[in-house]
Amino acid sequence: MELNGIRRRLATAKEAERHRLLLELIRAAAAEALDRPGPLPLDPGRAFGAQGVRGRAAGRLRERLSEATGLPLPATVVFDYPTPGALAGRLCALLLDEPAGPGGANGQMEAEEPIAIVGMGCRLPGDVRSPEGLWRLVHNGTDAISEFPEDRGWTVQQHPDPDHLGTTVTRHAGFLYDAPDFDAGFFAISPGEAVTIDPQHRLLLETTWKAVEDARIDPTSLRGSRTGVFVGLMYSEYGARIRRVPPGAEGYRVVGSMPSVASGRLAYTFGFEGPAVTVDTACSSSLVAMHLAAQSLRKGECTLAVAGGATVMATPWGYIEFSRQRGLAPDGRCRSFSADAAGSSWSEGVGVLLLERLSDARRHGHRVLAVVRGSAVNQDGASNGLTAPNGPAQQRVIRQALAHAGLTTAEVDAVDAHGAGTRLGDPIEAQALLATYGQGRPAGRPLWLGSLKSNIGHTQAAAGAAGVIKMVMAMRHGVLPRSLHITEPTPHVDWTSGAVELLTEARDWPADGRPRRAAVSSFGVGGTNAHIILEQAAPEPERPHAPEADGEPRPLPWPVSGHGAAGLRAQARRLADFLRAGPAAPDADLAYSLATTRATLTDRAVVVAADRAEAIARLTALAEGDQGPRVARATAVPRDRLAFVFPGQGSQWPGMAAELMSCYPVFRESIKECGRSLAPHTDWSLAKVLRGESGAPTLDRVDVVQPALFAVMVSLAALWRSFGVEPSAVAGHSQGEIAAARVAGALSLEDAARVVALRSRALRVLSGRGGMVSVAAPAGQVLRTLERWGGAVSVAAVNGPRSLVISGDPGALGEALAAFEAEGIRARRIPVDYASHSAQVEEIRDTLLTELSGIRPRPATVPFYSTVSGEPLDTTALDTGYWVRNLRDTVQFDRTVRRLLADGHTTFLEMSPHPVLTPGIQETAEEAGADEVLTVESLRRNEGGPARLLTAVAEAHVHGVAVDWSPAFAPHRSPARRPAVLRLSSGAATGLRTRPRPPPMFTTAGLDGIDHPLLGAAIPLADGGGGTLFTGTLSLATHPWLADHAVADVLVVPGTALVEAALRAGAECTGRAMLEELVLQAPLILPEQGTVRIQLSVGGPDGTGRRALILSSRPEDAGADEPWTRHAEGTLAPGGGHPRQDPGPWPPTGAREIDLDDCYRQLAKTGLHYGPAFQGLKRLWRLADDLCLEAELPDSAGESGRYGLHPALFDAALHAAALAGPSGAEPLTRLPFSWSGVALYTAGATRLRARLSFTGPQSLTLTAMDPLGHPVLSVGTLGMRPVTAEALHRAAGTAGTALLRLEWRRQAPEHPAGPDLTGWAWVGAGAPPAQPPDGRPYRDLAALRAELDAGAAVPPVIVLAEPATPEGTDPFTAARAALHRTLAAIQDWAAEERLAGTRLVVLTQGAVAATPGALPDPALAAVWGLVRSAQAEYPDRIGLVDTDDPGRSRAAVAAAVHAGEAQAAVRDGALLVPRLARVTATDGPGGPAWPADGTVLVTGGLGTLGRLVVRHLVTTHGARRLVILSRSGGDSAEVREFVGELLAQGANVQVVKGDAADPAVLERVLDGIPQEHPLAAVAHLAGALDDGVLAAQTPQRLDRVLRPKAEAAWQLHRLTARARVPLLAFSSLSGVLGPAGQAGYAAANAFVDALVQRRRGTGLPGVSMGWGMWATRSGLTGALSDTDARLIARTGVRPLTDEEGLALFDQARATGEPVVFPLGLDITALNSGAPDGIPPLLRGLTARTPARRAGAAEAPEPAGEDLAARLAATPEAERDALLLGVVRGHIAAVLGYDDPRAVAERRPFSDIGFDSLRALQLRNRLGAATGRRLPATLVFDHPNPAALSRYLRTLLLPDPAPAPTAPDGQPGPDQADQVIERLNSASLEEVLDFIDHQLGE
């Protein structure tokens, strides 16, 4: 572009467009300068150097810009204007001949104008982190003095003699223990540089940020402002303490601790351009800095000023020096002005104040905290000594400050004195105050005197600023806090010489009709004195109350941001905590302040929430890494090329603008304007149409829908613009071009309204004579097919690479449709009855030319891209003829999008009430290979309110679009009130603070600090051999990323960490070393709690320079005699080897890529559990027997710069070997055990390219380089060795069996406000009263169905309330009746199609014992068992709630429905959820001894388990008399053999045939037990199964299962109660887990558990044992298939061996628990399972770590529309494979296969283990995955996986193209409505019964 052309474009463009044009020029020139393709994506606000444009590249950039602009730019231009934004501003000024900005003050300043304090920040002793924290400390009278820090390596000893050399008289003062911690990444400071930065500088950076935010100013908004910096510092010894310069730190050490750089660093980091001064006047530094800042402001040198000071002591020399001078108090406390004052206390702290001229603060609306009325600074001069204070000088500085303020002494109420607590200094200061402020005061109004130093000690350079903050807070609270430690006033002062009194108690500080005033003094040890006078700020005007919400609360945006994902999560957590603390301000004010005063950083999120509770819940989820609904989250990239796109028809829906019209004035006014412009051409009201008012025409008329859509689209664009989002281009599809032209300024509103109204009216002539069809195929293929119909069918629109619309004659279209279907091309009709964009339009051409004549197009203010031509268009050509062509010609939308992409537009915002163009844009962008393309939809169908719009704005914002959030608060404004800017929590300034290491001030005494995360220190050995001992500690607290490395559920420190430590030790000893050999001897196990201490011993060199090494560990809390565990031995050799050069092409030619989808779930199945920190493997290729890979260090692994190679990244490179080992290798869990020839060439890599070459089944070599091909690491040989879970569990001490009990744990509701009860149905005799709108009561479901038949609305929730069992009722009879009722009700609910989307909640009272001492109702407990099983068959559709208060049942259900748990109890209003927890077990025989002469009655004792238990009673417990009651009797040979075996053991065994549930039989058996051998115990093992899906269950089938288990238990309890003997009942885990298909069995066992619990509650002995699975197959488990066994194993419950089961039987009796659940646990499976594979009850048993790891093999596919969108975005040739993978994954999960590839795609379901239950489970899973309601006949209709996947494809993508734009046609129904599901006349029971017989055998 030539110079005059640039100038012309700039002269006519708006300011934002000018800036954008010049940024594009700079980005293109930068790309040329760096020899890179395309414009360089430079961030306008970041320095060129930080973005790679430095050195020669900066010079080339200047040359390119000079050539492009014709400007003679100086060689220093990139340094003078160091960011792209600044340089663009400079170029704009030069090109438009604008004068340079002012360099000095703006106008005359008032020489004595007061200075406002508008912001404050501090960090002080006592863990004070804010001004509020300081106020709490002084108001509470807290003493913040504590002991010396232990981590600074201070070896100085305490000695009471002040003359004892080298010692200190005290080891107490006020410290900032975490002073070294720093969020370096937040300030874009590298780890290497951060190590060198003095902690004082770090604290100033963080505290300045907080002070600016405290002023309600976005810190980033001050970049380039004339803000001054005035900070006080007095120490600079930190840099000298860094004896070893860490890697990456050379060149920073000097400036890192120079005091002068502290102010410069602040200015540089924040972009301040006012004066920057560092002040060192010792203890008065910060007050002098404040005085200088005020002067600079008054002179106009700056507009804002940062003033303050900081002190952190790197060495203890100050204590030694002042001990010699007798200036320190022995106890470290300043006793200011007290008779027993004994010296000062050297403390630490930082205080920062933000100052502004008072007039400016008021003009800018900044809150004024206090006013600086006057200040003065002077010097002692030639006083009594260099360091001695001088009273007259102090009097002079006070009088100068008073004169400067224009005040008398009596007008100042209080002074926070220097008050250091010295015997000399305090009396001198007190006399000076008496001689000044003590004179001329009214009676009864003394000067009140105190000192902050009495609380926190002397914070030295920060003391004055801290005192100011204290007094400002005291003014604001109206209280003068007391000074501590004053026993009585010092006698060295004549207190009668003036009216001054000490603040020995806190005092109210009334204003008395005038502002409160106070002064602060600071005196430097060198004689520089400072005094500042503060005045209370004028009260802020009272604001009107927030307007009351008129109905539903309006949503608000809550934006947060951070540097990095961890920083963002930390910010979300802080904000959630702040809101949870309950600030009283309105939510709108809080959100407004957050949106307008906080910096917007790169990692962003926005929570859209209607109330505070919702905001807290979503922020909490965000902090935990979850992204729920109405939460946008992304990492921003620059997005200044943004296009507004406007669709044709198809996006409309009734009510699409109503909510926005009521909320946003901008939108409402735009609609009104459109309505006025349309009125002359229509006979209907736009507003009434949009609101759907009675009498208004509907949207099915083309002459209504097109003008209405036009108005909505234009108004949406106006609304987006009000949010500060301006388009750099516009494009419209068909009639959408009319709206685009209006928004671009190319048509007046009147002309645009005329075009859309008259053209749509003309279209009605064509109705009934045409049609349109969407086709999913490339344009060329479609055109070839259409050739046979000539002009009868035309291509109407090309929407994407494989998405077209054709139009024409109805008959020809029908033939074309059939032809496409015959070719296998998906095509479908669009419901319109005319053919726009076809020859039919010619019939209305003349009409249009006539009616649209007079249109006056004009030049656009925004570039207009025509979809008629597919190119940018001069909009003066948008005449009448253009709008006819727009209707007649093919819509070239695909071409237009490609041109927009080519021109650099990466963001597309769709201005429509429902997204129509977005899918096509995404498809085109993907095919075009465009990166970072963002598409945002404004609204969605039936989501047309502020929540949806704000979510759309949030999506744009988080991805990098600049947004002004002010319009978001329009619904929260009233004429009298706008949202206020509030002061938010000061803790939310920075993200994650970590400790840059190793500042040697924090190393252990006597050791050299090692800058390594694993090896903290080293000490040379004194044996003369040249050896070194390295030490370090490991724990999850210090190395949290190790929690993500678990093998078989045991935390194992990866071998790569040991190698890394060995390499670093070698480098420390020899400068550069190769690890010649390392053999791992034992795994290094990391405990969940506590610390492991490691030692790495490196011997001296031998004759060849080699050194032996040994690595050992033991727990840190181990006793002195506890041995160390040796983990590795090896050899270090000198030198690092020579890396192989010439890496060659990448990936290597011929390499075949391996799909890594789900790879970490696959590894988890082998026992290798890698959490996020270790999930670094990104791509993998196979080349013959070699593997090539790319790996990247995840953010969660922490810093990389201090490692040679981060162990997590090193380990990730080895994951390839586990995933794709050499051919023939067995699939075992292998870990590295030997290394040889390991050399490191480059330190700190975060990305690797590596090649693994297998040299055997268990050995390999590795070479790794960085992405530029530079060598990083090589491994000569790595040996792998299989490891077993048992071995690791032995090492870690974890168990494989467990005794569990059911606990009820309190859980906070996810939505504390509870759900809306509107429309709920309350069914049954136990239902609480319900009145509309909170639901309606129904006698039963039949009554509800009758209302539905009459047209009533379908309820969202049905509550089925089961009545409580009446007192005195037989519990089994009650249970049977309740179960029959519940079964019938659930079956009715499931069979009613109209209730398919309704949730069923079964409500009981007292069914579960949820609190200690409670006794459950066995009848209702049985109902819980049945419903638990039903939940497994109808996942996420049925809930269980138990309450203790019928009157609060509705509240209980409301709380539980949103609790996120399928089962819940509500007790005293608290929500409780069930979890299984471990019970302490005892070894050996447990419980009371079995009486040798007593009789044991056993039911079910002849089954497999029964015989096992009976034999155990005889052989282990010595039982000698047994009666076995069996329904089958003892006639079989097998039973006779068993009895004979027992007889041989000396037992007397009687087998009785009979039914234990028959009371007559049972009474007869009991009566037959002889008195000399009375009944001693009852063991109830009997049971029966009758499995089947719930729909096929009947009351009779239930009864068959209930009788032998539940009814028999009731009779046994009833008839043995008087005997008071133990009842040992065998129940099943199914009673609480509720497996699908076992409703009756689950109910029976739940009844038994509750019955025994009630029995125990009445004082009778007994225990119910709810067994998991036994390995020995019994009558209850013998029918289990292999599939059943796999599925059970997937839950983490493994079969018990006989020995384990019998041991648990004994232990269960000894626990004292009434109900226990003995089972075997496969901890690996338990922790590996996906959430839907592990029942919620068992999730509490999973190991704590790795909490974030990948789960077991499931089908981790996106659900619903996400899957459909993913399918649409997948190339046509890959879609079948994608869906088949989803289907096979879910089938594998249902059948319990670890690998989905085990599912053959064409094998019939009947051959792979499907029965009716598994058919139902697969239907449920696929229904959830697709978001569609699938028929129960799914498996029958589609008999193998391949057929099923084909069916799902047609369901998800009936037309795989994006939702077609019917350019001027009628609206198309939603895609979901297009799906025609198969209808079947059979009942569900008949279908399932058929599947059982056909597929289940």
UniProtKB/Swiss-Prot annotation:
Occurrences of domain Malonyl-CoA:ACP transacylase (MAT) (ranges): 644-962
Classification via SUPFAM superfamilies: ACP-like, FabD/lysophospholipase-like, NAD(P)-binding Rossmann-fold domains, Probable ACP-binding domain of malonyl-CoA ACP transacylase, Thiolase-like
Annotated spans, C-terminal hotdog fold: 1151-1289
Low complexity composition bias: residue spans: 1862-1871
Region annotation (N-terminal hotdog fold) ranges: 1012-1139
Residue span(s) of domain Ketoreductase (KR): 1494-1671
Single GO MF descriptor: phosphopantetheine binding
Modified residues (O-(pantetheine 4'-phosphoryl)serine): S1812
A UniProt-annotated Pfam family: SpnB_Rossmann
Pathway the protein contributes to: Antibiotic biosynthesis; Polyketide biosynthesis
Record-linked InterPro entries: Ac_transferase_dom_sf (IPR001227), ACP-like_sf (IPR036736), Acyl_transferase_dom (IPR014043), Acyl_Trfase/lysoPLipase (IPR016035), Ketoacyl_synth_AS (IPR018201), Ketoacyl_synth_C (IPR014031), Ketoacyl_synth_N (IPR014030), Malonyl_transacylase_ACP-bd (IPR016036)
Active site (record annotation): C283, H418, H458, H1045, D1211
Gene Ontology biological process: antibiotic biosynthetic process; fatty acid biosynthetic process; secondary metabolite biosynthetic process
Residue intervals of the Ketosynthase family 3 (KS3) domain: 112-536
Enzyme Commission code: 2.3.1.290
Top-level division of the source organism's lineage: Bacteria
Cofactor needs: pantetheine 4'-phosphate
Protein name: Spectinabilin polyketide synthase system protein NorA
Organism field: Streptomyces orinoci
